[in-house]
């Protein structure tokens, strides 16, 4: 009887072992060499590079740097190099808010205007949780400041963000009904935390998160001029070869501006696996998907992107600002965490993270796309055209170029893999053209397969512009960004100019609707008389701002 019992126990143990993925069974030296090989293109003293760190069961197994932290001074990247990690910052801001909630000082269900009374009342309650989960409907701060005249290399501060948000008279959508990635919410959270805690987010996080976890090389960077020893500079490629310095100029934080090392970040990720700070309930909140009012899961927790890879659960985040690129992923089923920071705008650390994980999990890279399907060129041409979303007011333009369907200006083609289904390179984006009903306009449904959210629907529209372009010329003022836009017709095309920005061409996409690189979708509006009385403009993340046409000298406004 004892032998049967022992056999049963052995079989049970084998089943449990088989059910849990095991790490690659190879000597550490061989495993580390395979990791090094992944970063071969980023080695040497003439290129920026990356830092990588891998932990297993909370202990660092491997950490190394590749390439240069400073091309000017020949300083190499090491695991101790400090990087700006951009949106990886968000999980710390959400956690800090959660710590204050544990103390009863705020609630995630509070209206944000309880703490930010200077913001307008949009007629719908926006909660702190909406800020955390990207469901607030607030417009994107960076896009708004650009529309207000800030250039990409201008200093942007918390006061600038509060100024432009206080001017807004509309939302992208009703709070809780959509998910749209948004930096504004996390910058506002940093202000709320400061007002509630009585100290800056930088000081609060240092006291309550970084110091207890031994993250000695981590801080929220709230002064762009502050000298940070061991900081890696960041770069973007120059036309014709070489590199340009590309560092962000921010004094706002919460949404970004965390400075840290790969080793410090893995100390934090270990806390999300086995909490030492904050407790299990708070960590669970970070790792739980938000849901919309419709009941749909967003796939985004509190500052963490949730997903699966190689059949395992994952959580983590990516970051990108100026020339800095970063990614971290945790595989809780295997107690594995991988962090990769790079200081070149052309690096893709998320791909490195997955490839390093494959080394440790003993898995092959997941196939990203199916085999291409042969589609007649005439059929592809039939899909080309201009498509518009009534929900987001955004436009996609598809063209047939070099025998392939692609978005206008895009390098990567849409690859057909099934009838009516196209994939885009190595991304998780898919474009589906459903069968048309008789006389119905053609649609394209664009979806991120890594997300639980539904596809965005675009309908094909007539790209014919209005016959009298000169009627669009004039000046238009938007109170929401305190800016006057001048429209002129040059070389047969409308062009827009505003303070401190380059002229941008308006490309016709149907009637009074145009698109531009800087202002997104621009739609001229008309009074009952038929005369142009204003325009709306906006991007996916800052939709439908309004500008009123200013009367020409000596003329009254049309009604």
Model segments located where?
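Sec/Tat signal peptide C-region and signal peptidase I cleavage site
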Residues: 20-24
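Short, surface-exposed loop or secondary-structure junction motifs
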Residues: 66-70, 123-332
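Bacterial N-terminal signal peptides
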Residues: 8-18
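Short, well-ordered beta-strand elements
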Residues: 316-317, 327-344, 442-447, 534-536
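Short, small/polar residue-rich loop motifs at catalytic or cofactor-binding pockets
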Residues: 45-49, 322-325, 392, 481, ...
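Short, conserved catalytic-motif segment at the N-terminal edge
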Residues: 26-85, 105-110, 163-170, 243, ...
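Peripheral terminal and inter-domain segments
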Residues: 25, 350-559
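Short active-site loop at a secondary-structure junction
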Residues: 41-51, 72-134, 173-184, 253-256, ...
């Amino acid at each position: 009887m004892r032998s049967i019992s022992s056999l049963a126990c052995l079989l049970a143990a084998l089943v449990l072992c088989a059910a849990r993925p095991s790490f690659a069974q190879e000597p550490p030296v061989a495993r580390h060499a395979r990791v090094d090989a992944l970063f071969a293109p980023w080695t040497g003293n003439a290129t920026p590079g990356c830092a990588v760190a891998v932990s297993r069961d909370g202990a660092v197994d491997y950490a190394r740097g590749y390439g240069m932290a400073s091309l000017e001074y020949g300083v190499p990247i090491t695991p101790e190099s400090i990087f700006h990690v951009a949106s990886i910052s968000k999980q710390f801001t959400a956690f800090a808010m959660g710590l204050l909630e544990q103390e009863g000082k705020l609630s995630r269900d509070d209206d944000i205007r309880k703490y930010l009374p200077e913001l307008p009342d949009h007629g719908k309650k926006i909660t702190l949780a909406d800020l955390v989960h990207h469901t607030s409907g607030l417009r994107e701060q960076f896009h708004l400041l650009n529309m207000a005249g800030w250039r990409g290399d201008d200093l942007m501060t918390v006061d600038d963000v509060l100024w432009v948000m206080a001017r807004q008279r509309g939302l992208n959508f009703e709070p809780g009904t959509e998910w749209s990635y948004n930096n504004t919410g996390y910058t506002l959270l940093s202000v709320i935390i400061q007002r509630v805690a009585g100290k800056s987010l930088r000081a609060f996080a240092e006291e309550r998160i970084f110091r207890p976890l031994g993250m000695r090389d981590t801080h929220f960077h709230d002064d762009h001029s502050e000298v940070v020893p061991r900081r890696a500079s960041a770069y973007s490629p120059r036309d014709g070869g070489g590199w340009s310095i590309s560092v962000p100029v921010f004094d706002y934080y919460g949404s970004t501006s965390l400075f840290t090392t790969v080793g410090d970040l893995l100390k934090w990720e270990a806390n999300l696996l086995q909490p030492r700070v904050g407790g299990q309930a708070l960590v669970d909140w970070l790792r739980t998907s938000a849901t919309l009012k419709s009941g749909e899961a967003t796939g985004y927790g509190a500052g963490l992107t949730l997903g699966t890879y190689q059949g395992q659960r994952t959580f983590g985040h990516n970051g990108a600002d100026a020339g800095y690129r970063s990614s971290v992923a945790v595989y809780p089923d295997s107690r594995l965490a991988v962090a990769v920071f790079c200081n070149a705008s052309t690096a893709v650390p998320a791909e490195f993270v997955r490839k390093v994980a494959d080394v440790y999990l003993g898995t092959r890279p997941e196939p990203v796309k199916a085999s291409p399907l042969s589609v007649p060129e005439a059929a592809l041409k039939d899909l080309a055209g201009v498509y518009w979303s009534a929900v987001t007011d955004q436009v996609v333009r598809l063209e047939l170029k070099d025998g392939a369907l692609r978005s206008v200006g895009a390098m990567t083609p849409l690859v057909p893999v099934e009838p009516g289904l196209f994939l885009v390179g190595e991304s998780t984006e898919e474009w589906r053209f459903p069968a048309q009903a008789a006389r119905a306009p053609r649609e394209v449904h664009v979806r991120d397969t890594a997300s639980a959210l539904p596809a965005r629907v675009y309908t094909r529209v007539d790209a014919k512009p209005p016959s009298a372009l000169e009627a669009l010329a004039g000046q238009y003022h938007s109170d929401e960004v305190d800016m006057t836009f001048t429209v002129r017709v040059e070389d047969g095309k409308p062009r827009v100019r505003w303070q401190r920005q380059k002229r941008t061409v308006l490309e016709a996409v149907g009637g009074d609707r145009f698109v531009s690189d800087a202002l997104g979708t621009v739609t001229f509006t008309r009074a009952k008389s038929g005369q142009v009385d204003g325009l709306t403009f906006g991007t996916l993340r800052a939709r439908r701002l309004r500008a009123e046409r200013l009367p020409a000298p000596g003329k009254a406004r049309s009604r």
